[in-house]
């Protein structure tokens, strides 16, 4: 271990790593002072150790562990400007040039100021930091510095790299493709003048293509998701190895473990060099520090790791400060008209109020099929030449898109001035989209934590934002129970479309809601019928436990697909699926009989109702699509994307 430290960090760092530390038990006031203010100085040789300290807490709804081995960082002279790092000889000037000149970032965030010095000293560090606080640059900067000072890589040339596939010095593990790609974008900007080569290994992309790129260009920093990283590193024939790995980073550690990646992370570590033979620094960044994270810390980090807490105990969480409202829908079929009404009124209001921020929203759904269906519907609307929303871009992100498509959606939405991103939960954590004015959640979220993380995509970087939830009246008791204590206010005035009975044969022509309902009906006709049928099935699973009676749930979903999506009757379920969902004896469920169709409907209402003529007048148009559309396993998608260009590839699942 000493030899590895000498080789990698020099004699001073090796001595620092090996000399016994002075341990003292500070007072509570000392602990708080060390956590909240980096200005107060204390001897560097003193390392604070606390046991069940009162300042170790989290705003997370999860039960928090009270670990007894968290070692707090000792405060020193503060770092405020990135140029300070170069002036004090802590970071190579080429890295600082990329940050200050190219990225135009001069002043550090609190997270960067509090973590950079500790990480640059070579210690293993567990940092508790929220997303959107600059933590990516906080770990990338020392990662690059470690590479730049590695004597075996002297002569790095940004004009001509001589890296190989076995030159990997840092591996960064991220829970999602989107976050991994986001980190990679920032890493490549940081590498502009250094000669450091950044590569990615994420699910949803062509593995062979990624391997060839690493083999052709080499790699110093490999960023990826657990499944693909394990796949790449476990292949002994591809030549991608990390025999001299100096840094391992786990970003969003709490989510990595929440998503069940613990075993994959352990497997990845087994594929890396023995840390007793090749010394490496391990960094973990996590918004919360539950027991699962501490268990991973003990398996991964050195015993003398540092804990840097950048979340103040008195800091009010986003979900307690952002204005939040909920709207009660008469039926699920009211959701799309309500969305259209809200967006249209806001955009039209921008003309009257030039100081109003451009509308930029993320709309969350609980299923990928719902996400795709609503995206296709709104896309048909914004493509209309004279529609008020013609200048609003629309994008979709969910796990059934290829990684290339998801990356393009993220990039375009991030850069857009006014846009709507229809998303599943793949963007709910860690993703940073600037200037998001609204987060709108359709239907009850899976759990309280999901609601909070989704809401966190707005009101970032000292900007304001709003949160809205459109919930069915049948979900209301469970919704209020789930989000008890969160300052949600009932809104009864904004949406004229929310309470309209769309099951009636005729709509009131004088109602302001009729305009939006009719626009949705016209647009959804162009959506493939196969996608609508799958949307019906996708609603059954997530909503099954939220209604008091299964019959009420089936009635609500049947109304949605008939009066909202325009299907003549609700789709049939296979006998096996109906039985597995416990719906085989529920009135209103149509069960397929493969000898000939039969229904299990004790009372079979006329689902075509008064809308029959409205839908029938364009039934042929609703079934026949332009030649530039084709059927895929996830629905009938356009062959070319007006906003992105290029051909849509087949969908792939996440690792």
From Swiss-Prot:
Q: Name one GO molecular function term.
A: ATP hydrolysis activity
Location in the cell reads: Mitochondrion matrix
- Which reaction equations make up its catalytic activity? ATP + H2O = ADP + phosphate + H(+)
* UniProt name for this protein: ATP-dependent RNA helicase mss116, mitochondrial
Please give the organism. Answer: Aspergillus fumigatus (strain ATCC MYA-4609 / CBS 101355 / FGSC A1100 / Af293) (Neosartorya fumigata)
BP-aspect Gene Ontology terms: mRNA processing; regulation of translation; RNA splicing
Q: Which Gene3D superfamilies match?
A: P-loop containing nucleotide triphosphate hydrolases
The UniProt keywords, alphabetically, are: ATP-binding, Helicase, Hydrolase, Mitochondrion, mRNA processing, mRNA splicing, Nucleotide-binding, RNA-binding, Transit peptide, Translation regulation
The UniProt entry, under SMART domains, shows: DEXDc, HELICc
Q: Where does ATP bind?
A: 129-136
Domain called Helicase C-terminal: residue spans: 341-503
Helicase ATP-binding domain location, by residue? 116-307
The record places the transit peptide at: 1-56
Record field: compositional bias (Basic and acidic residues): 605-614, 621-642
InterPro entries hit by this protein: DEAD/DEAH_box_helicase_dom, Helicase_ATP-bd, Helicase_C-like, P-loop_NTPase, RNA-helicase_DEAD-box_CS
EC? 3.6.4.13
* Chief location category: mitochondrion
Residue segments, region Disordered: 594-642
User: Which PANTHER family does this chain map to?
Assistant: RNA HELICASE
């Amino acid at each position: 271990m000493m030899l590895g430290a000498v080789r990698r960090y020099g004699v001073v760092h090796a001595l620092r790593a090996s000399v016994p530390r002075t341990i003292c038990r500070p007072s509570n006031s000392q602990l708080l002072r060390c956590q909240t203010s980096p200005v107060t100085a204390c001897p560097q040789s003193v390392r604070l150790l606390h046991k069940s300290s009162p300042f170790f807490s989290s705003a997370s709804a999860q039960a928090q562990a009270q670990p007894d081995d968290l070692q707090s960082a000792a405060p020193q002279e503060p770092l405020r400007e990135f140029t300070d790092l170069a002036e004090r000889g802590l970071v190579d000037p080429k890295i600082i040039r990329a940050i200050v000149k190219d990225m135009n970032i001069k002043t550090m965030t609190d997270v960067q100021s509090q973590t950079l010095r500790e990480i640059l000293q070579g210690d293993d560090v567990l940092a508790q930091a929220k997303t959107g606080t600059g933590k990516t640059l906080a770990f990338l900067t020392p990662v690059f510095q470690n590479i730049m000072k590695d004597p075996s890589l002297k002569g790095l040339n940004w004009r001509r790299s001589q890296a190989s596939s076995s030159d990997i010095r840092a591996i960064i593990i991220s829970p999602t493709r989107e976050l991994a790609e986001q980190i990679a974008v920032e890493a490549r900007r940081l590498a502009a003048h250094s000669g450091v080569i950044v590569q990615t290994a994420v699910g949803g992309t062509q593995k062979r293509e990624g391997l060839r790129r690493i083999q052709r260009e080499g790699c110093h920093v490999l960023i990826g998701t657990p499944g693909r990283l394990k796949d790449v590193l476990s292949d002994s024939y591809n030549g991608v190895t990390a025999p001299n790995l100096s840094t391992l980073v786990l970003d969003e550690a709490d989510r990595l473990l929440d998503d069940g990646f613990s075993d994959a992370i352990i497997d990845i570590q087994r594929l890396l060099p023995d840390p007793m033979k090749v010394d490496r620094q391990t960094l973990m960044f996590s918004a919360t520090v539950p027991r699962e994270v501490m268990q991973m810390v003990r398996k991964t980090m050195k015993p003398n790791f540092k804990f840097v807490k950048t979340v103040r105990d008195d800091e009010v969480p986003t979900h307690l400060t952002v204005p939040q409202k909920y709207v009660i829908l008469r039926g699920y079929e009211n959701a799309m008209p309500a969305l259209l009404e809200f967006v249209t009124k806001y955009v039209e209001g921008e003309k009257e109020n030039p100081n109003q921020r451009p509308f930029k929203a993320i709309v969350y759904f609980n299923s990928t099929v719902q996400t795709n269906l609503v995206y296709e519907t709104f896309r048909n609307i914004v493509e209309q030449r004279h529609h008020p929303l013609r200048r609003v871009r629309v994008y979709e992100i969910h796990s059934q898109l290829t990684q290339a498509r998801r990356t393009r959606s993220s990039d375009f939405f991030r850069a857009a001035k006014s846009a709507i991103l229809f998303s599943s939960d793949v963007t709910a954590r860690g993703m940073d989209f600037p200037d998001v004015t609204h987060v709108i959640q359709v239907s009850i979220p899976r759990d309280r934590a999901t609601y909070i993380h989704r809401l966190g995509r707005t009101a970032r970087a000292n900007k304001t934002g709003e949160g809205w939830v459109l919930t069915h009246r049948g979900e209301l008791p469970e919704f209020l129970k789930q989000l008890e204590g969160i300052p949600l206010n009932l809104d009864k005035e904004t949406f004229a479309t929310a309470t309209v009975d769309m099951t009636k044969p005729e709509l009131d022509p004088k109602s302001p809601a009729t305009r939006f309902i009719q626009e949705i009906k016209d647009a959804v006709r162009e959506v493939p019928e196969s996608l609508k049928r799958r949307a019906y099935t996708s609603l059954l699973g997530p909503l099954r436990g939220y209604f008091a009676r299964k019959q009420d749930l089936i009635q609500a979903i049947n109304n949605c697909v008939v009066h909202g999506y325009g299907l003549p009757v609700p789709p049939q379920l296979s006998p096996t699926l109906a039985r597995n969902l416990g719906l085989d004896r529920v009135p209103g469920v149509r069960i397929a009989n493969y000898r000939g169709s039969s229904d299990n409907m004790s009372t079979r209402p006329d689902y075509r109702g008064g809308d029959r003529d409205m839908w029938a007048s364009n039934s042929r148009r609703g079934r026949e699509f332009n030649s530039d559309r084709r059927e895929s396993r996830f629905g009938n998608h356009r062959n070319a994307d007006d906003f992105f260009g290029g051909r849509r590839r087949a969908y792939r699942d996440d690792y």
